[in-house]
């Protein structure tokens, strides 16, 4: 941890500083004044227990915060004292006598003012209502499309039949213009009409009124039932070229009847015209004469009546109601809480401590099955040595077994594996015998450059090894001895017979390991084989039941003890000072050789023998140790 427990304790010397660094709001004004910064800084500089740099940094932050708050409180007290002093010693303030301690009534009472409630209300004309409403009103030209209003075709003479329609006769129908003016004023707004008006239009309107007064009682145009104008202008039947919606007829129906014009035709209600006031007069533009203009009269009038635009209300998305989710389980049982408190599996892991020493760490790294079967017992950093070691680990399959495997002579896999794992295969015996012959031939090739004594010694050893009788008949070993030819031995024996015999003492040979007589060790080997079988059975039982220490003691008591006694008898009889493991393991299978090698290691551990090896993969020489004759 980067902090010490004494820092976090409530009564510790740095408790308030630690609290100020991590929870500043928890400190009160009393805590700030009680904190002694000098002692705290000294305890941070020279702490009783070693603190991490991170802890000291946090404590310095707490010191700075406490100092800041102390300075702030001091400044506030100074300001308050300054204000009080300033208020107490104001210039010109005199202490009041006892008579004037009570203030006057007029000084502390507000005067009562009664206003006149009979005042007239302000004039409504003073309030500019239009200005208030025009703030949010757009200009007509900006929001309205300009439309070209055509001329009234009925005002032009078209010489239709004998019905002479001159200007004076048409102007008698002044009521038609008046009614049409009412229609336009009631259905459309004056804002949609152009404001520019010429003086000629006003004069023309005055002439219309004069003609109407003169010929009011003329009754011209009565009895025109079924007339051309009546059929074309008043009829509401469909089929017109520009007859879209009947908006004009509806507006004409809604107009009230006027009693001043009782003698007027039905055309007066539908005919067009301008309003009475000059403000609403429609400016008429001259248009060229067109054919069949009578059918276009109602359609042109419809251009004035714009259809009302639907008010588009902005649709707002309805807020989706929140669905209230209520838990089915509202309370936790005490059993559930206890189970959660007792369950600490997520914060606890298995304890995996590293070995205390480097040697144990190295053993742990290289003690696995993968490393034991792929690397030697000692660290080899050279790649060549590792290749040599791995080359010895690869088994050589005999050729006859390969042929049998390819030819399918093996009955099943178990038989093939048994034959492959059998250490007494002729192939291995032949290889061992070839190695023996190589060992025998090497000194013979180098003999001419040595003295005669060395030649005699080598010949003696060769004679002893060649004269060694074969081991007792045991299956394949006897056959291997018969099959093994020895073409080199007869010439060696001939050369040895020609050399004069020289008597040599047994102590003089340089390599006494080769003088170990195999005849004396044969009965011991047979006994060892029988005992090894018994030991194997006992070891299997011990693996299932006993401990490791008991197994090691039993192995030492039986197999290793027999090896030690055999070595003692061999060295006593031959007088040799050392024994070769390679010579001791001749004519044995792999299991027996491994057992002897293991016995050598146990004896070396018990200081019964000393082992020496000149180079890797060379022969191991055993010499008596300090406890060779004691055990």
Swiss-Prot record:
There is a cross-link at residues 48, 216, 418 (Glycyl lysine isopeptide (Lys-Gly) (interchain with G-Cter in SUMO2)). Residues 154-171 are annotated as: Interaction with NIPBL. Keywords: Activator, Apoptosis, Cell cycle, Cell division, Centromere, Chromosome, Chromosome partition, Cytoplasm, Cytoskeleton, Developmental protein, Disease variant, DNA damage, DNA repair, DNA-binding, Intellectual disability, Isopeptide bond, Mitosis, Nucleus, Phosphoprotein, Repressor, Transcription, Transcription regulation, Ubl conjugation. Residues 258-285, 423-489, 517-558 are annotated as: Disordered. Changing residue 450 to A: Abolishes second cleavage by ESPL1, no effect on nuclear localization. Residues 271-285 have a biased composition (Low complexity). Residues 423-440, 522-532 have a biased composition (Basic and acidic residues). The C-terminal part associates with the ATPase head of SMC1A, while the N-terminal part binds to the ATPase head of SMC3. This is Double-strand-break repair protein rad21 homolog.
